[in-house]
Amino acid sequence: MSNTPIELKGSSFTLSVVHLHEAEPKVIHQALEDKIAQAPAFLKHAPVVLNVSALEDPVNWSAMHKAVSATGLRVIGVSGCKDAQLKAEIEKMGLPILTEGKEKAPRPAPTPQAPAQNTTPVTKTRLIDTPVRSGQRIYAPQCDLIVTSHVSAGAELIADGNIHVYGMMRGRALAGASGDRETQIFCTNLMAELVSIAGEYWLSDQIPAEFYGKAARLQLVENALTVQPLN
């Protein structure tokens, strides 16, 4: 048992960021209601961060916060805020102003070295060979995730590496959770509520119709999510 009443530890969480492109609260409210209706198991009562960097017109922050909260989403912070007056209004409501992480500059390529003798590279993989049911969340840290059975709506797969689903995929699949943009998602039957690679995501209605219910492979190409047949 710890000798101190609290302990501070670093951690990370998967959060949705809502980028606001309209300053009218009623418009935002309706747009969010429409999105939530498309994937209620994923978005209903979800914690979200509001990004206001694209707002050009003045915004009534109190009304905006109420409009978003009325959908059931839980606003836990705001990012992309550069306006001093808006910052003051946000902080007055007790919401933190968050600073999004910047991409690191690429490091110089290391000098090639001769491989060590008698070493075999090991690729970690987490294997799930039972159905993943609604409400379950499977996380594969620092490795790939393979599911050999069905994934129900309302279930969530998260991996720092690739995700493979050899069954009907009805839930949510988030590959590259730690930011690896080279990861991919492979499904033999793509019917997902949401697919995401390194934060770039599609809801079910954004998956091209010709790939819905089909074997598919998803990856990022020029920072955009793409899908192609899984051969």
Curated annotation (Swiss-Prot):
GO terms for molecular function: enzyme inhibitor activity; identical protein binding. Keywords: Cell cycle, Cell division, Septation. Changing residue 10 to D: In minC19; reduces affinity of MinC for FtsZ. SUPFAM superfamilies: Cell-division inhibitor MinC, C-terminal domain. GO terms for biological process: cell morphogenesis; division septum site selection; regulation of cell division; regulation of cell septum assembly. Residues 101-125 are annotated as: Disordered. Disruption phenotype: In a minCDE operon disruption (minC-minD-minE), cells divide not only at midpoint but also at their poles, yielding small minicells and long rods. Loss of polar localization of several polar-localized proteins including GroEL-GroES, TnaA and YqjD. Pfam families: MinC_C (PF03775), MinC_N (PF05209). One of its GO terms (cellular component) is cell pole. InterPro entries: CAP/MinC_C, MinC, MinC_C_sf, MinC_N, Septum_form_inhib_MinC_C. Residues 114-123 have a biased composition (Low complexity). Signal peptide: none annotated. It comes from the Bacteria. Transmembrane segments: none annotated. Interacts with MinD and FtsZ; homodimer. Cell division inhibitor that blocks the formation of polar Z ring septums. Rapidly oscillates between the poles of the cell to destabilize FtsZ filaments that have formed before they mature into polar Z rings. Prevents FtsZ polymerization. Belongs to the MinC family. This is Septum site-determining protein MinC. The lineage of its organism: Bacteria, Pseudomonadati, Pseudomonadota, Gammaproteobacteria, Enterobacterales.
